[in-house]
Amino acid sequence: MDEKEEREFILNATNSIKTTCGRRPVGWLSRYLHTENTRRLLVEAGYKYHMDDYSGDVPFIDSEHPELVVVPYQLDTNDMKLWLNAGYTPDMWLKYAKDTFETLYREGEQSPKMMSLGCLLY
């Protein structure tokens, strides 16, 4: 999508959430990948954090947009595995999530780590 379409998409989503919930969101997580314009457009729209980043497990400040915190999102701990793979059970997902947490907890002794759990409403 071009910049104008993306700006409209962000503003429409923001207004929809504000209308439905009574207040506007301060963070952005979209099912779409971001473009080279997304973070700037989010800052323009008043957002404080952006979660469409899959590059790591430590939040960071975007050097081009220092008013925006980038909060990584880990796809591997998303429960979508349950509906993408018929043989994947909730217990298997929970074990994977616990193992991931334990690994990041150990690694966190040396440097900060963060873990996200994506839980979908089925």
Q: Which sequence ranges carry the predicted segments?
A:
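Catalytic alpha-helical scaffold of carbohydrate-active enzymes acting on polysaccharides/glycoconjugates
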Residues: 1-27, 32-69, 94-117
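Surface-exposed cleft-lining segments at the edges of enzyme active sites
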Residues: 24-25, 80-91, 119-122
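A structural motif
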Residues: 63-81
